[in-house]
């Protein structure tokens, strides 16, 4: 099952990278890798995330990171919509 990212999700990741590079450069690479790897596991378990705030979406909570990935399952595709910091208002 493919897991494409929307342009908005890709932009979210770029903002996360920029923030981490500026404030926590020693954590940037490992954090981004963990985000990618955890999202990749949705292929095997697409319903792993909780029901999302918007109808038809789900939210993947990262156990060791303060981020949430919003996604939707559409046909045979899992589409990553956004990545939020857990403290961020949506």
Where are the model-predicted features located?
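Structural motif corresponding to alpha-helix initiation and N-cap regions
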Residues: 54, 64-65
């Amino acid at each position: 099952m493919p897991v494409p990212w929307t342009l908005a999700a890709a932009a979210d990741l770029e903002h996360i990278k920029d923030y981490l590079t500026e404030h926590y450069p020693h954590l940037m690479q490992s954090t981004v890798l963990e985000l990618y790897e955890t999202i990749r596991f949705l292929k095997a378990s697409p319903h792993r995330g909780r029901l999302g705030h918007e109808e038809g979406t789900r939210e993947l909570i990262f156990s060791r990171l303060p981020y949430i990935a919003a996604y939707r399952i559409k046909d045979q595709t899992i589409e990553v919509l956004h990545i939020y910091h857990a403290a961020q208002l949506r």
